[in-house]
A protein has these predicted regions:
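Non-catalytic terminal regions with compositionally biased, polar/charged low complexity
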Residues: 101-113, 118-198
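Trp/Gly-enriched beta-strand surface patches
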Residues: 33-98
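Non-cytosolic beta-sheet module surface loops
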Residues: 2-5, 106-108
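Acidic (Asp/Glu-rich), glycine- and aromatic
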Residues: 3-33
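Short, hydrophobic/aromatic-enriched beta-strand segments in well-ordered soluble domains
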Residues: 15-17, 71-76, 80, 84-87, ...
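Short glycine-aromatic motifs
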Residues: 19-27, 34, 82, 135-138, ...
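Short, surface-exposed linear segments at secondary-structure transitions and domain or protein termini
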Residues: 20-26, 81-84, 94, 169-182
Length: 198
């Protein structure tokens, strides 16, 4: 998700999910009392349940839903806050589902980029009470280019492979040929994006 602006803003990127939190790469603290996250723009309907702080360049958030495992791996800045919220604040008639969300909050930012991988992996068998492939396969995620025309990331997998993803920010024509040079390596492709080995 890329946002451009002519002034400084706070950006929140929410991931709404169903299920149970299994693991995070960051420490978080639970809020002692459930209070709304804000006063308007929908924030008045979100309870703030917990807050964590980004630290090492990536944040991972894993959960299980319907006996399947999922992980979000996000490239984050050390100043980003990681919020755990739940829908349902200021809802006296219980019209809202009490669904949880994971929010990456970036304060005092101009143009900004949120790079994330949402990964389904593995399953849980209730009959044998065993989990298969319950851990993420993504080791890291790095933004290596974020410009006006192109954005590019790399990510390393537990298999040892490194993947490369580049996107043309201003031209989604499937026939346009793009050329991008990064670290003395030239990438060329047609269409809005390139997904390749690195």
């Amino acid at each position: 998700f890329k946002a451009t602006t002519s002034s400084i803003h706070q950006f929140d990127l929410p991931f709404h999910y169903l299920g149970q939190i299994l693991d995070t790469s960051f420490e978080y603290s639970s809020e002692p009392a459930l209070l709304p996250l804000g006063e308007r723009s929908g924030y008045q309907h979100l309870y703030l349940e917990g807050v964590g702080q980004a630290s090492d360049g990536i944040a991972t958030f894993s959960w299980m839903n319907d006996n399947k495992f999922y992980t979000i791996t996000s490239a984050v800045a050390e100043t980003d806050s990681l919020l755990l919220t739940r829908l349902g604040a200021n809802d006296p008639d219980f019209n809202l589902r009490r669904d949880p969300a994971f929010i990456i909050r970036r304060r005092s930012s101009g143009d900004t980029l949120f790079a994330s991988i949402i990964e389904p992996h593995g399953s849980y068998d209730r009959v044998t009470e065993s989990a298969v492939d319950s851990s993420s396969h993504v080791l890291n995620l790095t933004v290596i280019r974020d410009g006006t025309d192109y954005t590019a990331v790399t990510f390393e997998l537990t298999s040892g492979e490194t993947k490369f993803f580049a996107m043309a920010n201003n031209n989604a024509d499937p026939n346009t040929v793009h050329t991008l040079s990064i670290d003395s390596v030239e990438y060329q492709w047609a269409g809005p994006y390139l997904y390749a080995e690195r």
